[in-house]
């Protein structure tokens, strides 16, 4: 059994709803891998769920799936951001919530770009997408860490 057989058997048969649920589950699982919840095994499972959801999807839909994964992840891992805006930024409830939402929207774009790249690479050769995943993920993390310092 080669990668193409697995790809055809698994990825091509998922409905839109299943793909959306996989992306959401991926974001929740990734959040659960971090110290607040401390289930480190999910750190390996979460990206795999997103990859399975993205392979075989169109690039725009893959972008949405990645964004959904990022939004779920950041919503669960940085809720303290809202508190900081309220207590130290002295923002009213609605404005602090809006800033929190904007942060989630912006940071989730990196996950969306990751998913779109993997969908593009995997369109004709899923095995290449699987090989590209670590490089694209590390590139995404590097960009997230250094983007504010680039300008």
Map each language-model feature to its residues:
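Membrane-embedded alpha-helical bundles of multi-pass enzymes
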Residues: 6-151
């Amino acid at each position: 059994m080669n990668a193409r057989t697995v790809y055809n058997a698994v990825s091509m048969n998922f409905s839109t709803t299943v793909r959306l649920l996989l992306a959401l589950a991926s974001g929740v699982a990734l959040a659960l891998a971090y110290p607040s919840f401390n289930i480190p095994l999910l750190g390996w499972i979460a990206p795999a769920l997103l990859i399975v959801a993205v392979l075989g999807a169109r690039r725009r839909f893959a972008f949405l799936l990645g964004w959904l994964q990022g939004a779920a992840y950041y919503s669960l891992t940085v809720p303290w951001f809202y508190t900081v805006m309220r207590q130290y930024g002295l923002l009213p409830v609605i404005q602090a919530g809006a800033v929190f939402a904007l942060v989630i929207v912006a940071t989730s774009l990196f996950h969306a770009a990751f998913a779109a790249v993997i969908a593009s690479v995997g369109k004709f050769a899923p095995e290449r997408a699987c090989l590209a995943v670590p490089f694209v993920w590390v590139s995404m993390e590097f960009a997230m860490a250094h983007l504010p310092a680039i300008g």
